[in-house]
Amino acid sequence: MTKEMQNLALAPVGNLESYIRAANAWPMLSADEERALAEKLHYQGDLEAAKTLILSHLRFVVHVARNYAGYGLRQADLIQEGNIGLMKAVRRFNPEVGVRLVSFAVHWIKAEIHEYVLRNWRIVKVATTKAQRKLFFNLRKTKQRLGWFNQDEVEMVARELGVSSKDVREMESRMAAQDMTFDMSSDDESDSQPMAPVLYLQDKSSNFADGIEEDNWEDQAANKLTHAMEGLDERSQDIIRARWLDEDNKSTLQELADRYGVSAERVRQLEKNAMKKLRAAIEA
């Protein structure tokens, strides 16, 4: 990420209401406008194009951040972290993939906010493993009361989240534990002390469905991509997955050429043809 893009991502949110009004005032981009800007950024490194892409998607960061209001953290801070995720997504977005930026960026936005919540919600980090993180961000959605789960509820949650009953009990205990502050306040008024987030985890005012999911953009794009992939032959599917969809272990043209016993140029041609078919199917 360039320094200029970092500065834009880390810009102070300031007054929250004013910021949200400003974010919502930016016009949304059409698919053609978005693609043109993404191509300028991807192929030419055009920072003005990046800025427009970012500003036109700030409203979606606000929608995502509202879903985390129940953790007792400042909304402005959550939004700012989400903006960092948006910046990372814009930097990595490839217009040739054929999906809208919002569908690609929502995962990066959530990832940054998740990390921020885990770092700041408690002094002691409550979720360190993949299973614990899954529990941390889903337990509040399934918890029906503020007391302890009974055994039937523990087993139900464990089944729904694909974890063990022991994991559920352990995370419930961690989330219910009280933190000790390092600097005790001189003010003895109990009303001045912040309440533990566990007391208001059931946040009824936040509904992400009113944001991105209400428009169904992410699901729509994902379904179109899935159906489009099914229309490709097995080799083309493998090439697209290896070159575009496997974020952690992307293959080079030469690696795929060695796998299939063809030239790297042939793999490039197959990739180009497959991408063309995917775009046609998605835009249909």
Curated annotation (Swiss-Prot):
Keyword hit for Protein biosynthesis: no
Sequence motif Interaction with polymerase core subunit RpoC, location on chain: 77-80
PROSITE patterns linked: SIGMA70_1, SIGMA70_2
Localization annotation: Cytoplasm
Family indicated by similarity: Belongs to the sigma-70 factor family. RpoH subfamily.
Primary role: Sigma factors are initiation factors that promote the attachment of RNA polymerase to specific initiation sites and are then released. This sigma factor is involved in regulation of expression of heat shock genes.
Protein name per its UniProtKB record: RNA polymerase sigma factor RpoH
Species in which this protein is naturally found: Citrobacter freundii
